[in-house]
Amino acid sequence: MTKLRKIIHIDMDYFFAQVEEKANPSLKDKPFAVGGTNPKRGVISTCNYIAREYGVRSAMPTAIAMQKCPNLILLNTDFAKYKAASAVIRDIFYSFTDKVEPLSLDEAYLDVTDVKEYKNSATLIAQAIKQEIFNKTGLTGSAGVAPNKLLAKIASDINKPNGLYVVTPKQVDSFVKDLPVKKLFGVGKVSQEKLKSMGVETCLDLQQLSLATLVDKFGKFGSSLYNYARGIDNREVNPVRIRKSVSVENTYLEDLKTLGACLEKLPSLYDKLTSRMTEEHYKSIIGIVVKFTDTKFNKTSLTRVAKILDKEMLKNLIIELHQKRNHPIRLIGIGVKLGEIDDKQMDLF
């Protein structure tokens, strides 16, 4: 019999903005956002909940955010400050268990299956972690507790901010049936639209499709979809996860018709990328990459050997890649390759 796992997903609330709010308490009752300080070309990185009441959202162009909230305060990003807070939070995670899988500065999975303290209760452990984070940083985070990573991550988003949501093994079936398929790990806009065209919008809808049908339509991912629709996820919390890359991308509502329009997106993408990188990532950079998807869904990318994350090199890659395109751009992605440089590895790029 498979051992029942106890997984916690911690997601800090409006992390960058909350760190800024803690550093400057006068912001607490004002709508403000981090990033996107250029009112014409900027893009919001994150914002506090007061700003969200006006309709301001992450990844929103600053011009639109200012229309929705004319008195919105814009702050420059301060990644040194965010990384310092993240380091404290990560140390707290490791004080509870060695089985920690960081996903970014403000998010991590913890496997507490074998933790004997707190009556071996994942719920009590999650409460204790949240309290310890608040005691040491003054920051709040939301936690999801479940038998696997898939459900824990979904659960952590339910009672934000400063929330805790528990999915017990007996609740899995009832919990997943009404979930929109877009909540499932690996389901992006393309997969979501494809499923919708098949009459699938919820996990209950997805459960009606056979494994053979899903594999036929989605390949290897079809098998995962079959399991996810039933709340099954066998992925382990990987405390020694070796990442081969860190990347970010954005799909734009308005097609980018000029090189200048593409270059204007680089600062916000760069900020988003650096926010996802840890100190270890910076030490193991072996290359940088830029990719485009155009309005005809053609995908192209360029990679260069590099030992540092160089914004100017990213800019030059965008310029070079843009020269190869015949159609407006809909998606831009940037990232870094991680590992040890050797000729064979670079050929794989």
From Swiss-Prot:
GO terms for cellular component: cytosol. It comes from the Bacteria. This is DNA polymerase IV. It is found in: Cytoplasm. Binds 2 magnesium ions per subunit. Gene3D superfamilies: 3.30.70.270, 3.40.1170.60, 5' to 3' exonuclease, C-terminal subdomain, DNA polymerase, Y-family, little finger domain. The record marks F16 as: Substrate discrimination. Keywords: Cytoplasm, DNA damage, DNA repair, DNA replication, DNA-binding, DNA-directed DNA polymerase, Magnesium, Metal-binding, Mutator protein, Nucleotidyltransferase, Transferase. The keyword Magnesium applies. GO terms for molecular function: damaged DNA binding; DNA-directed DNA polymerase activity; magnesium ion binding.
